[in-house]
């Protein structure tokens, strides 16, 4: 651990629609504890003393963002999102470069629908990776028994869970390195599911930092209900 935490930029890709929620609006705009999920996710970073600024990538025709108090927050900059997550993040990185951010600056990319990031986990990630040559991400070791299946849904084998981790966010990398990895992987039409996979594709090995399992990404209705119950029980 280090005495002081490094300064960082935060990027929130929020242009997705979240079809699996079967809701009347993108999942990041659903209500949780009196605010939208997106506002909670933004709030995980906005009051951190090491934050240099935050960029949120939104759908071009997003009708919900202008109605949020966050839309007028001077610490938040908006850019247009892409058709995929990687494009949304890349647009945000291009914006940071245009604003004068340095290639060696740290950037933390966080899911718009992951509203329960703890300050302890954020500080742990910053401290553990401050001097890392690559960067890394919060992750949680797999706990359940894992099965590999064939195309018919039949079990082929049981996977050794001791070497399997679930990738969470934030994911923390240097601005220049992440920009190059994402841009090159898009040109190569590589399958990129998160920032760490782009760095892996570029030949680097991100470091996993164990975080809390309740840093949950809202993907299905039951995820939102679980968070609502948990937050109610805290009061």
Swiss-Prot record:
Keywords: Isoprene biosynthesis, Nucleotidyltransferase, Transferase
GO process terms (BP): isopentenyl diphosphate biosynthetic process, methylerythritol 4-phosphate pathway
Superkingdom of the organism of origin: Bacteria
Function, in words: Catalyzes the formation of 4-diphosphocytidyl-2-C-methyl-D-erythritol from CTP and 2-C-methyl-D-erythritol 4-phosphate (MEP).
Alphabetical list of Pfam families matching this protein: IspD (PF01128)
Catalysed reactions, as listed in the record: 2-C-methyl-D-erythritol 4-phosphate + CTP + H(+) = 4-CDP-2-C-methyl-D-erythritol + diphosphate
Site for Positions MEP for the nucleophilic attack, residues: 161, 217
EC number: 2.7.7.60
Designated name of the protein: 2-C-methyl-D-erythritol 4-phosphate cytidylyltransferase
Family stated for the protein in its record: Belongs to the IspD/TarI cytidylyltransferase family. IspD subfamily.
MF terms in GO: 2-C-methyl-D-erythritol 4-phosphate cytidylyltransferase activity
Site keyed Transition state stabilizer: positions: 20, 27
């Amino acid at each position: 651990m280090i005495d002081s935490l490094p300064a960082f930029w935060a990027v929130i890709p929020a242009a997705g629609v979240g079809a699996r929620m079967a809701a009347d609006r993108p999942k990041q705009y659903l209500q949780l504890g009196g605010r939208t999920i997106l506002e909670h996710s933004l709030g995980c970073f906005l009051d951190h003393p090491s934050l240099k600024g935050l960029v949120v990538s939104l759908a071009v025709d997003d009708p919900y963002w202008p109605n949020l108090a966050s839309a007028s927050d001077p610490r938040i900059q908006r850019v247009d999102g892409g058709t995929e997550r990687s494009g949304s993040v890349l647009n945000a990185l291009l914006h940071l470069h245009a604003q004068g951010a340095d290639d060696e600056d740290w950037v933390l990319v966080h899911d718009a629908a992951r509203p329960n990031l703890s300050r302890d986990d954020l500080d742990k990630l910053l401290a553990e990776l401050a001097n890392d040559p690559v960067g890394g991400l919060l992750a949680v070791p797999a706990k359940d028994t894992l099965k590999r299946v064939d195309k018919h849904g039949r079990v082929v084998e049981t996977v050794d869970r001791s070497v399997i981790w679930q990738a969470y966010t934030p994911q923390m990398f240097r601005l220049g390195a992440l920009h190059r990895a994402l841009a090159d992987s898009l040109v190569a039409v590589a399958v990129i599911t998160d920032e760490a996979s782009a760095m892996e594709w570029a030949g680097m090995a991100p470091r996993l930092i164990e975080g809390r399992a309740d840093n949950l990404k809202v993907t299905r209705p039951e995820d939102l209900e679980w968070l609502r119950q948990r937050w109610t029980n805290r009061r």
